[in-house]
Amino acid sequence: MKAFVSVLGMDKKGIIKEVASVLSEKDINILDINQTIVDNYFTMVMHVDLSDITIELGALKSALNKTGEQLHLKIRVQHEAIFTAMHTI
């Protein structure tokens, strides 16, 4: 299964490292990454492969929410089909 991880918030050092570390610890492969900083506002979308995930999806969402709270960010995980449907005109 593939999914998208979206990260939003004020820019600071270490955001990509912290999010990637959580994913790596759970054996999740990052397929693609796009990040932008506009007027100190950080946005990132990661396309990830959950084929080898070592925990339940709900537990992954909780782990990323905890990281988001620590960094004052919003982090969301969405199944690829849902993300694609939401972003198709």
Model-derived regions, located:
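A conserved regulatory-domain signal marking ACT and ACT-like small-molecule sensing domains
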Residues: 1-89
